[in-house]
């Protein structure tokens, strides 16, 4: 297990990723042997526990603001889903009523591919319009309002995972290689 944790940590090392970026795109990664094996294994275990057990981590204390959308309510409609993030303000707009704020800058720097984990979640929960009218009429489609509370909880937990992952990877930068 320690070897697996060590490899997981090395593959998350920002210096390793930067130095071997081109190689990582073209071939299988080569794992260097760093002097303090057990420190790297401990970081890898911590990262793995965060990434695998993201549903069990404590939710980050984001401020939630709910302002009723009187227009939508008067028309008998659900709030309009937006699912937009503004990293510069540290806010996430879920719909025309709900905004989460207090997202720390570190949460936006943890990337899964080319997007932050938070942006990835927002993209996955967006309502998509089906092009085929037959399917649209006859089948029950996804509605964000049915999953809103689940998404709020998930965003808070993934914020915790992102912040803690960035803290660990920043500590890796200072380690001797």
How should each PLM-predicted stretch be described?
Residues 1-177:
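Sequence-level detector for compositionally biased, low-complexity segments
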